[in-house]
Amino acid sequence: MRKIIINGGKKLQGEVTVSGAKNSVVALIPAIILSDGVVTLDGVPAISDVDNLIEIIEVMGGSVKRDGETLEIDPRGVKDMPMPFGKINSLRASYYFYGSLLGRYGQAIVGLPGGCDLGPRPIDLHLKAFEAMGASIFYEGEAMRIATDAGQRIKGAHIYMDTVSVGATINTMLAAAKADGRTVIENAAREPEIIDVATLLNNMGARVRGAGTEVITIEGVESLHGTRHQVIPDRIEAGSYIAMAAAIGKGIKIKNVLYEHLESFICKLEAMGVRMTVEEDAIFVEEQGDLKPVDIKTSPYPGFATDLQQPMTPLLLKASGRGKIIDTIYEKRVNHVPELARMGADIQVLGGQIVYNGPTQLSGAPVKASDLRAGAALVTAGLMADGQTEITNIEFILRGYSNIIENLSDLGADIRLIED
């Protein structure tokens, strides 16, 4: 069993460069199946989710060349075949293959997706959109087959999303890119990652308008071609490092940051009294003095990102006073709370809210990452704590944070990965 060992209490200093966005690249790679030519992605993060997606593409007959942060994918050999269930079941973003395979072949046979257990994240919205576009859904054991009649081309449709959903918005875009006719998505999610996927599709020859707004229109085309695309910076990784720098840093510059993707998060930090300087593509976080507590309520973009409430929680424990966190998107995103309490934090879940009292001096302890962003919170807590922290279940962390051990070591952290 692999684990991360941290000897905490050391102030960190230096620079860290944010990698390409995980939540973009896990959709961009499946999107490439729609292309009739080679597609190159630059700025691809070194995370296990990418490794798994590459393996899926190769099993299906595509070819992949990887050179550092550059990924070259030739999808022309991809076959119309059932997906490899092992990798599919471990990876929630595998559902993006539904849309891309539907767009290419008129059907997709896939295992049901895995990923972090954060409470209800149903794919009903995805399936409702596919049905509106002429597909039928069949359950076959642990797999699901989504298909048009006799593999016909999927049809454009007018779709209203009952709930704002990043995954369903992207999946509908993928299916619609080569559909017969126009697709309109109303109540679409507005996240930067959706704009990134739309940019790739348009660079491949698709006709997507309105990405980043509540109404997206896609005029289906018959074919898409190869291109080259730069993945946007990971705003969640950036926010995680910014919160970490405020909690345990004595001067850290976070590079490759797009401020406009983090405005609601930065506003909360400013309300706490965090001292930082925003530059064109970087943020410098100073060593902090006294901090004030704030309340956080997550909401769809451009609101406070649910993916940032856990990485920010250890920083909140440094504030003098009481505050609360309400996650309106994923109700079970509280599994980091008992682990932080194990480290001495005055924090608990009351009535569906996280309530904290600070400031708290954390102590090292054995803890377990229950999901990706909870893992990031525990890493920050371990860096803040007196003594040694041992984090298990670290596969969650490694699937979303590129080179995190190396990056933190370069900042002066006493952190290492142990292979038991």
Swiss-Prot record:
Top EC class of this enzyme: transferase
Reaction catalyzed: phosphoenolpyruvate + UDP-N-acetyl-alpha-D-glucosamine = UDP-N-acetyl-3-O-(1-carboxyvinyl)-alpha-D-glucosamine + phosphate
Binding positions (UDP-N-acetyl-alpha-D-glucosamine): 92, 121-125, 307, 329
Any GO CC annotation of this UniProt entry: cytoplasm
Cell cycle is among the record's keywords: yes
UniProt-listed GO biological process terms: cell division; cell wall organization; peptidoglycan biosynthetic process; regulation of cell shape; UDP-N-acetylgalactosamine biosynthetic process
Classification via PANTHER family: UDP-N-ACETYLGLUCOSAMINE 1-CARBOXYVINYLTRANSFERASE, UDP-N-ACETYLGLUCOSAMINE 1-CARBOXYVINYLTRANSFERASE 2
Full protein name: UDP-N-acetylglucosamine 1-carboxyvinyltransferase 2
Native source organism of the sequence: Streptococcus thermophilus (strain CNRZ 1066)
Taxonomic lineage: Bacteria, Bacillati, Bacillota, Bacilli, Lactobacillales
Gene name linked to the record: murA2
